[in-house]
Amino acid sequence: MTSRSDLLSAVADMLSTADSIALCGHVMPDGDSLGSMLALGLALRSMGKQVHLLSPDPVPDQYLGLLPGADDIKSELQVPDIPEIFVSVDCSVPDRLGHFKTLLNRFGGIIIIDHHAGGVNFGHLYLNDAQAPAAGEIVFELLQLLPVDINVDIALCLYVAINTDTGSFRYDGVRPATHRIIARLMETGIPVSQINKQLYEEKPVVCLKVLGEVLKTLDVSPCGKLASMYIERNTLNRLNARDEHVDGVTNYPRTIKGVELALFFREMDDKRFKISFRSKHFVDVNKLASQFGGGGHQRASGCIVEGKLVDIRRQIVDAALIALEEEGK
């Protein structure tokens, strides 16, 4: 088995020898996917590489005004020649690359950089560390092996990546190395207070309207350990809300005293729901989500299920209650 350090070196070597590189994040891009991709892209461009930044879905507004280079991210690969290397950032499931999945067989080399459990090795180099709380940590380590300086722009992107995927450093996966990396990033002079205000205190009013509608659906189980909420597409349409305006809602039920497991059901389109799972202490929600074709981390995961909301909720709530009983012993 190839060691982690050898994998990092192999990835650095492949990137160093390539002239043109495509970097792609996952559908419904978040701060870790975008921040990690942009940090790596800025670093590679400083090495003289031709870099194409790709996202299957639009970049949320809150990141466009915050992350350097975010306005350069494209939804299509608009070049006559396919780049030599394709790097999947924060994603090790081909379907989560959206329409870019269909281009994978056209690249000479494919690198996967991820930290989600249950991924698939669909590339030539598979750098997946499920112990890392964010892909941004892995990218930071990778940059130590490349001839680049971590400047303010790169540091800002990595700070956003790690900050957002660790719940502002509140989640279980945060480790001493996380804070050491953050210290290194802060030493470049990034405006940490300003970044956090823009991430968490500059939301459009529609976000609060969405939250208000979602909170009306809050349901806590008789045992007090399971809480769930949902939002349907017709409600989002009535509020003129986009999917990005729902981000962060998932964690609200978990803040209730005594609740171990939180579920959030979001209608994506007709009869397709994204279910987000969050746990506090002991329920392995990666295992729970895998029962429905999904996955993620022990304390945060998700899946997509097709059907009627009432049936999906009943099925998943039943499975969640079983998990609470079995894993709480």
Region locations from a protein language model:
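An acidic intrinsically disordered interaction segment
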Residues: 1-9, 103-110, 131-139
